[in-house]
């Protein structure tokens, strides 16, 4: 799906390690009004982020208008409200909704139900915390000809639950399990054209919820070439930033001809 599984640890995180990483990043990266603290796990799982480190992390984040962390919908412990009270800016919690497709949900085995996701959104809303969600394009169990529609249905579910921002992530292979699912004809790699279709339709479909396409490793998606990739990437970047449709450049390559056909 994504490559964050590469960075998970076999043992609980040692106290102080995350604080040191954050201090290093703040010293070496340009200033920004927002900060994402994505830790390849769940921010409010004390095995991943020791609870004793939360006040120190919040202290280092006082200058930011928005602090974004990732968390599982079923981890709803007191640390969430405590951390929200510590940070100076708005806290936003990102959750991997992924899909509402029943078969795909079973294959992904994220260990939460749609009701769990809704309950998490309601709980965060009660605490005054914004919600963000990740939605997968063509996860295992979703057929290619249905995948765009299922993304749009999943986005609608997120919107209904008050999610502020959804990121559409093309499902990627590479972790072993995905290769096995490919052999079983349960997973088909999505194309760049599908991602374009998703974003075009999504930004026209929601008034308040921001929808963006994840562009990392875009060159690994099928259906693009050296002639068209740069132009299509720039177009997606423009739509991500403006939340408005952007015209396609008229390019002479077989990829674009296939899309037009």
Briefly describe each language-model feature range:
Residues 25-30, 55-62, 80-90, 122-128, ...:
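Acidic (Asp/Glu)-rich catalytic clusters
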Residues 165, 171-261:
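Auxiliary Fe-S-binding modules of radical SAM enzymes
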Residues 68, 102-110, 137-145, 182-186:
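Surface-exposed cleft-lining segments at the edges of enzyme active sites
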Residues 38, 54, 63-74, 114-115, ...:
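Conserved N-terminal glycine/acidic-rich loop preference
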Residues 41-43, 73-75, 99-101, 137-141, ...:
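Active-site-proximal loop/turn and secondary-structure-junction residues that shape catalytic pockets
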Residues 3-21, 25, 29-48, 60-76, ...:
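Core AdoMet radical
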Residues 12-24, 49-57, 113-117, 147-155, ...:
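Well-ordered, non-membrane alpha-helical segments in soluble/globular domains
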Residues 115-177, 196-215:
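Conserved C-terminal portion of the radical SAM core fold
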């Amino acid at each position: 799906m994504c490559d964050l599984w590469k960075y998970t640890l076999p043992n609980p995180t040692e106290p102080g390690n995350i604080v040191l990483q954050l201090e290093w990043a703040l010293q070496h990266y340009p200033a920004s009004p927002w900060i994402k603290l994505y830790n390849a796990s769940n921010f409010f799982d004390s095995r991943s982020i020791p609870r004793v480190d939360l006040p120190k992390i919040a202290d280092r984040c006082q200058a930011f208008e928005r602090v974004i962390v990732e968390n599982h919908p079923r981890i709803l412990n007191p640390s969430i409200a405590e951390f929200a009270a510590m940070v100076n800016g708005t806290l936003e919690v990102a959750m991997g909704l992924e899909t509402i497709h029943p078969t795909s949900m079973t294959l992904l085995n994220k260990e939460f139900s749609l009701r769990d996701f809704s309950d998490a959104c309601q709980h965060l809303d009660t605490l005054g915390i914004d919600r963000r969600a990740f939605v997968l394009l063509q996860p295992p169990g979703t057929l290619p000809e249905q995948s765009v529609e299922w993304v749009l249905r999943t986005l609608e579910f997120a919107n209904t639950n008050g999610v502020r921002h959804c990121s559409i992530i093309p499902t990627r292979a590479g972790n072993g399990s995905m290769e096995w699912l490919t052999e079983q004809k349960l997973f088909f790699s999505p194309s760049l054209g599908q991602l374009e279709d998703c974003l075009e339709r999504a930004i026209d479909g929601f008034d308040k919820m921001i929808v963006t396409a994840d562009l990392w490793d875009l060159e690994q998606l099928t259906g693009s070439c050296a002639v068209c990739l740069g132009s299509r990437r720039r177009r997606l970047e423009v739509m991500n930033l403006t939340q408005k449709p952007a015209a396609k450049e008229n390019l002479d390559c077989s990829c674009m001809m296939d899309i037009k056909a």
